[in-house]
Amino acid sequence: MNLVSLKDIVFGYSHTPVLDKVSLDIESGEFVGITGPNGASKSTLIKVMLGMLKPWEGTVTISKRNTEGKRLTIGYVPQQISSFNAGFPSTVLELVQSGRYTKGKWFKRLNEEDHLEVEKALKMVEMWDLRHRKIGDLSGGQKQKICIARMLASNPDLLMLDEPTTAVDYDSRKGFYEFMHHLVKNHNRTVVMVTHEQNEVQQFLDKVIRLERGEKGGWKCLTWNSCDELF
């Protein structure tokens, strides 16, 4: 079952195309890595998939339902973590708890399941012991971790991650890859992740999408269904 399909996508800035006839399919239950050199428009590709950027040409299709027939939910962690506004949420715990709020139910009363999911997400990124710390007192790497935790707490079917581990240490990155692999293989999640840590993550990936320069100057997609084919 295809969750995401791109067909002949062309997109650019001003009058310069950066994605040139990009086509790809992402199936349910895959751990997909998007790679390529710096400036290869990997972040742009993710934003086109999410509908944050409208392509000049081509079509983007995202399934409205998961494999169980329920409404598909999507989690997104951007490359650049925006600065958090003062006020609510003011602590690590409050921010991650907000991942459990559904649309139209901000400040809902959290139940036992909600609290367990929040605790599990914070422990996964090794931030449980800092749950009462003010967000303004966190380092860049810690802010990146709690953004990941907030997404995990929402239990999305499709996880879209734009270099989510750039500011964290090697052991934390490895643990994160292992957990993503666990979600894919044991909980029927689908993960799409932009990464530069190819050597670290390759053993966990089901598919690799690499952006390479096309003849007209834009970036094209090459897809490998086995990491061994690329690496």
Curated annotation (Swiss-Prot):
InterPro entries, alphabetized: AAA+_ATPase (IPR003593), ABC_transporter-like_ATP-bd (IPR003439), ABC_transporter-like_CS (IPR017871), Metal_Ion_Import_ABC (IPR050153), P-loop_NTPase (IPR027417)
UniProt topology in membrane: Peripheral membrane protein
Coiled coil region boundaries: none
UniProt keyword Transport present: yes
Inducers of expression: Repressed by zinc via the metallo-regulatory protein Zur.
EC number(s) reported in the record: 7.2.2.20
Localization per record: Cell membrane
Domain ABC transporter: from-to ranges: 4-230
Record's keyword terms, sorted: ATP-binding, Cell membrane, Ion transport, Membrane, Nucleotide-binding, Translocase, Transport, Zinc, Zinc transport
CDD domains, alphabetized: ABC_Metallic_Cations
Catalytic activity: Zn(2+)(out) + ATP(in) + H2O(in) = Zn(2+)(in) + ADP(in) + phosphate(in) + H(+)(in)
Enzyme kind, highest EC tier: translocase
Coarse class of the protein's main subcellular location: membrane
GO molecular function terms attached to this record: ABC-type zinc transporter activity; ATP binding; ATP hydrolysis activity; ATPase-coupled transmembrane transporter activity
UniProt KW Translocase keyword: yes
Gene Ontology cellular component list: ATP-binding cassette (ABC) transporter complex
Function: Part of the high-affinity ABC transporter complex ZnuABC involved in zinc import. Responsible for energy coupling to the transport system. ZnuABC-mediated zinc transport is required for comF expression and competence development.
Quaternary structure note: The complex is composed of two ATP-binding proteins (ZnuC), two transmembrane proteins (ZnuB) and a solute-binding protein (ZnuA).
Family statement drawn from the similarity comment of this UniProt entry: Belongs to the ABC transporter superfamily.
Record PANTHER family: HIGH-AFFINITY ZINC UPTAKE SYSTEM ATP-BINDING PROTEIN ZNUC, METAL TRANSPORT SYSTEM ATP-BINDING PROTEIN TM_0124-RELATED
Full protein name: High-affinity zinc uptake system ATP-binding protein ZnuC
Organism annotation: Bacillus subtilis (strain 168)
Organism ancestry: Bacteria, Bacillati, Bacillota, Bacilli, Bacillales
